[in-house]
Amino acid sequence: MAELSISSLESLTLKGLYEKAKEYKVSYYAKLTKKELIFAILKAQAEKDGFLFMDGILEIIPSEGFGFLRPINYSPSAEDIYISASQIRRFDLRNGDKVSGKVRPPKENERYYGLLHVDAVNGEDPEIAKERVHFPALTPLYPDRLMSLETETKKVSTRIIDLMTPVGFGQRGLIVAPPKAGKTMLLKQIANSISANHPDTKLIILLVDERPEEVTDIERSVHPDVDVVSSTFDEVPENHIKVSELVLERAMRLVEHKKDVVILMDSITRLARAYNLVIPPSGRTLSGGIDPAAFHRPKRFFGAARNIEEGGSFTILATALVDTGSRMDDVIYEEFKGTGNMELHLDRSLAERRIYPAIDILKSGTRKEELLVSKSHLDKIWAIRKTMQDSPDFVERFLRRMRASKNNEEFFQNMEEDMKRKGTARR
């Protein structure tokens, strides 16, 4: 029987794939998408030949040239698959590539599975993957496509973001969060809105130095297709860095394939703290005890977010911790403050009064928002901002009015009617 490849299967019609699926006894093949069906057939063929069909995220060992595919949480595990230097060179594989193929179990004196044949790279034919442009050569642009987050009437948080701090594909956003202001809840709502409104977007949630129970909570709260990658507080700082950098490389590889990628990160502050513990001391120290050299690599991570002229985008929304009682955290926030093109501030005083979402609408905003929303929409946003007051009572009234409207469009209509009534009353 002829060896199947991803390219030969992609050239078949759905009817042809169904015939192959019957031949290889693939279950429930009619319910699968074309992509899922191709991988199910490849897996069935590998098992028929006495092998396994596995995939993982590639991490190349720099000094050796070979690498390992990490199938579990982007981290080393007993399930890792060895991939030779010759396979990496042949297909121009890079850190963060998702490599799929036939795998043999470890032999008597071996620790790892061995990759026999590369069948797919990031879901594409390996020969096509060789031709892609490297991420640094892609042209960065301001975000110009709105990432709509509005879903249900009750989900006011995401409706406010759409109104006052619109997020575009390729946004580099900071969520500035004091303790107990509802940042985890907000991240979950943003994640679920992206999954609902933009199912083709690849979403990764990266949790650095977080509590293990919080990781479980987020895993159970989001869509199954979302990658929740974590390095909890009981791991060493080196692990925080390793996992974060592999997630970054993964996102870059997908953007090279012209995909839209979103990373929701909690938090950039803790990643910077991890780098501060690991990097060789430069001999200089900023206020709070942080080494200036510790900022370079977290800034490289955050700075990778961009809209791409050639197609695809890379969005990062990262939390920055403030008012924690640590001077270091404030210095880290000040250092990242000017690097983003969108900021969403959470207000502790609102959270203490149990006013949720505790968003400080006055301080929050997006650069170049005119590229994301229409002129009429922008005029309405500016009209709202002109009437704003820096008080919890105003925010409470604003939230009450939002909940009274079904969606943002209705909220705008109600606001226009109010302004007309006030204008008539003045006359």
Question: Where do the model's predicted regions map?
Answer:
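Basic helix-extension-helix modules of the SAP/HeH family
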Residues: 1-49
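OB-fold/S1-family RNA-binding modules
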Residues: 5, 13-16, 64, 195, ...
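N-terminal "pre-motor" subdomain/linker immediately upstream of P-loop NTPase catalytic cores
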Residues: 35-129
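Flexible glycine-/small-residue-rich
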Residues: 41-43, 60-62, 71-73, 85, ...
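Phosphate-interacting basic helix/loop segments used at nucleotide- and nucleic-acid interfaces
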Residues: 50-54, 156-160, 247-249
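Short beta-alpha junctions and helix-cap segments that line functional grooves
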Residues: 55, 83-86, 102-105, 114, ...
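P-loop NTP-binding catalytic core
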Residues: 93, 106-175
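P-loop NTPase catalytic core
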Residues: 173, 181-184, 189-427
